[in-house]
């Protein structure tokens, strides 16, 4: 079984200036024109050897839009949205509004104190990790007997936590090192259900974005 984890393409909420005001966490943030171009390149240059057996996606709009463009090449492949692939859960509104810089600080604090809800309604890193682990455990049970390629569209933190889970490492490792998760980059992992072992074959693969023409 191969897992192909892909971060969504560039979205408007990814390019905010540090002093930009946020009155809410935006799950409906749309792709930029550059992001649409990234998703098109991913679709067109995606390796035939990794043709998907099934496609999973976070329900957040930026992930769904990326998956939707990708699926243009694979319209008959089963598609599943799973809430457990969402980015962190956050308050419906910030009163008073916060800046993008303050939001980034909250994300750093989640790493330093993974068991804490930094602000009311902001999901802790540990809770996020737990739901992602549940997703994979269910996935492995469902496809344990199949030689398949499973494409998963999700978010940067979800990819970080997924890889920690595959390696059997705790969230505290994020204080020491992190794995870059660029927009539309592929992280390819082979899973052997017999031994329960993982092999990281490629991380943050952006080769499709290097093509010209």
From Swiss-Prot:
Gene Ontology annotations of biological process type: antibiotic biosynthetic process
Catalyses which reaction(s): 5''-phosphoribostamycin + H2O = ribostamycin + phosphate
Annotated keywords: Antibiotic biosynthesis, Hydrolase
InterPro entries reported in the protein's UniProt record: His_Pase_superF_clade-1, His_PPase_superfam, PGM_Phosphatase
One of the record's GO molecular function terms: phosphatase activity
Keyword Isomerase: no
Pathway: Antibiotic biosynthesis; butirosin biosynthesis
Enzyme class: hydrolase
Protein task: Catalyzes dephosphorylation of 5''-phosphoribostamycin to generate ribostamycinin the biosynthetic pathway of butirosin.
Name this protein carries in UniProt: 5''-phosphoribostamycin phosphatase
Annotated source species: Niallia circulans
